[in-house]
Amino acid sequence: MIREEKKSDNKKILLLEENVLGPGRYARPSFRLRESLKPNIKYSKVYFKGNKIIGSIRYFNCRINNQSGLMLGPLIVDQSFKGKGIGRELMNQSMSSINSNSINFIILIGELNYYSQFNFEVNTNIYFAINVRQEKILFKKLLDKNNTFFGKIELY
C-alpha cells in the first residue's frame, strides 16, 4: 500500500535509508544538499507491507530562476523487496500526484539508465552549488511551456 508520508514516518524512513544506503550516503552530493532540509510531505510517499515501511520516495522544494520545482530523492526500497517493482510504483504514484500548475519541473541526482523510463533527461544548463557530475543531474519538465531552464538549482 502506498500513501503520503506523515511527519511521524520520519524516524522509520531514516532507519530504512541507513539500512539501504549505509554510511556511504553521507558522502553523496544528494545527501549533503538535502541534509538540513525537510521533505515536502505533500508529494513524498511511503510503501507499506503490513505495518512496516519497505519503500520511500521523498521530494524537496527547489527552484531555478524563480521557477518552482521539486528535487526527488532518495528513492529507497528495503533490500529484501528489490526487483519487485516497488520503486517504479512509488515513482509513478508520486509523480502523478504532483500539481503541474505550481510545480514546473523535477530534478534528481541519479542514473539515467533507470530514470529515463520516467522521462528524465540530462540537462547541462543547470547546476548545484556543490560539485555534482553533470551527467548525474537529471531533469523532467512538467509543463509544456517553452520555458528553458538554466542556472543554479536552489533548495529550500
Where are these predicted regions, by residue range?
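Conserved beta-strand in the GNAT
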Residues: 46, 52-62, 68-76
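Short amphipathic alpha-helix that is part of the acyltransferase structural core
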Residues: 1-30, 46-53, 144-156
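Conserved acetyl-CoA-binding loop-helix of GNAT-fold acetyltransferases
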Residues: 77, 83-96, 108
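Non-DNA-binding regulatory cores of transcription-related proteins
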Residues: 123-137, 144-149, 153-156
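Short alpha-helical functional segments enriched in proximate histidine and acidic residues
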Residues: 20, 97, 114
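Conserved active-site alpha-helix within GNAT-family acetyltransferase domains
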Residues: 100-104, 110-134
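Short loop/turn motifs at secondary-structure junctions and domain boundaries
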Residues: 35-40
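Short active-site oxyanion
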Residues: 1, 95, 99-105
